[in-house]
From Swiss-Prot:
Keywords: Cytoplasm, Developmental protein, DNA-binding, Homeobox, Nucleus
GO cellular component, one term: cytoplasm
DNA-binding region ranges: 94-153
Induction or repression: By nodal/nr-1 in the left lateral plate mesoderm.
Cysteines paired by S-S bonds: none
Predominant cellular place of this UniProt entry's protein: nucleus
Role according to the record: Involved in left-right asymmetry of the developing embryo. May play an important role in development and maintenance of anterior structures. Could play a role at the interface of lateral plate signaling and heart and gut morphogenesis.
Region (Disordered): 17-37, 58-106
Protein name as catalogued: Pituitary homeobox 2
Comp. bias intervals (Basic and acidic residues): 69-82
Cross-referenced Pfam families: Homeodomain (PF00046), OAR (PF03826)
Underlying gene: pitx2
Basic residues composition bias: residue spans: 23-33, 90-99
Family that this chain belongs to: Belongs to the paired homeobox family. Bicoid subfamily.
Length: 326
């Protein structure tokens, strides 16, 4: 039985070895198949990547070789350069060159400007031909010259108004306080027409006229004083006849009617009315009553004394009214 078991055991071992070998061979064959598929896939991927690289290289070569792309690249580079540059460089590029004119060119341009300040296109072209300049330069020169001319005209007008017409207007447009310092307009009715306000200022019309005291008194007196004046003026011829060398035709003798020397020639009985009050004085009710009382007192007290020539006898009617007391 043991002998029978041993060969069976060997056969079994051989069979197991064959099966193992076959199984190992099968596994190895499968592994080889997997490696083949991987290698084939890698080779295919490598081919594809190579094709892509070749395609990219072809595209890049074709892009760089085209003129449009080259111009685009140049423009992009110039833009970057412009952006990198500073602002003063731009200003220097945009600034125009100043034109330096010769003396002959300036003489020709000035002579044309004196004749015509606004030349048209044809005239400017002719001037450009004469002066060897461009039409644009001639146009700019005329524009600047007109601006300078306008500025000079404005300055001259301002100087004329300041120097020529200034003193005249200042003399005519003085304030009222400087022109009439002796009285104010608010107290016009209270003060009246005093001769001080008239004598402080030069009025050639009134100073040249020899004003009649009777007419001036009739202008500025009340109705009561006018009636008394008419009666007293009626007595003037009889009073003047007693004075030797008196002339009624002259106005100076009429101015001397209010002097006390004429009143002494008239007797007391021949003058029943009060003598006229000083002329050219504005009278209200209070002033007229005070003046009449003072004159009555003088009439009774001063007739017996010798008369003294007053210094106000040679004055005019306006000044005489100020010197005599009221």
């Amino acid at each position: 039985m043991n002998s029978m078991k041993e060969p069976l055991h060997l056969d079994h071992l051989a069979g197991s070895r064959v099966a193992a070998a076959s199984s190992h061979h099968h596994h190895h064959h499968h592994h080889q198949h997997q490696t083949v598929t991987l290698v084939s896939m890698a080779s295919s991927l490598g081919q594809r990547s190579g094709e892509c690289k070749s395609r990219l290289e072809v595209h890049t070569i074709s892009d760089t070789s085209s003129p449009d792309t080259a111009d685009k690249d140049k423009s992009h580079q110039t833009k970057n350069e412009d952006s990198s540059t500073d602002d003063p460089s731009k200003k220097k590029r945009q600034r125009r060159q100043r034109t330096h004119f010769t003396s002959q060119q300036l003489q020709e341009l000035e002579a044309t400007f004196q004749r015509n300040r606004y030349p048209d296109m044809s005239t400017r072209e002719e001037i450009a031909v004469w002066t060897n300049l461009t039409e644009a330069r001639v146009r700019v020169w005329f524009k600047n010259r007109r601006a300078k001319w306008r500025k000079r005209e404005r300055n001259q007008q301002a100087e004329l108004c300041k120097n020529g017409f200034g003193p005249q207007f200042n003399g005519l447009m003085q304030p009222y306080d400087d022109m009439y310092p002796s009285y104010s307009y608010n107290n016009w009715a209270a003060k009246g027409l005093t001769s001080a306000s008239l004598s402080t200022k030069s009025f050639p019309f009134f100073n040249s006229m020899n004003v009649n005291p009777l007419s001036s008194q009739s202008m500025f007196s009340s109705p009561n004083s006018i009636s008394s004046m008419s009666m007293s003026s009626g007595m003037v011829p009889s009073a003047v006849t007693g004075v030797p060398g008196s002339g009624l035709n002259s106005l100076n003798n009429l101015n001397n009617l209010s002097n006390p020397s004429l009143n002494t020639a008239v007797p007391t009985s021949a003058c029943p009315y009060a003598p006229p009050t000083p002329p050219y004085v504005y009278r209200d009710t209070c002033n007229s009553s005070l003046a009449s009382l003072r004159l009555k007192a003088k009439q009774h007290s001063s007739f017996g004394y010798a008369t003294v020539q007053t210094p106000g006898s040679n004055l005019s009617a306006c000044q005489y009214a100020v010197d005599r007391p009221v």
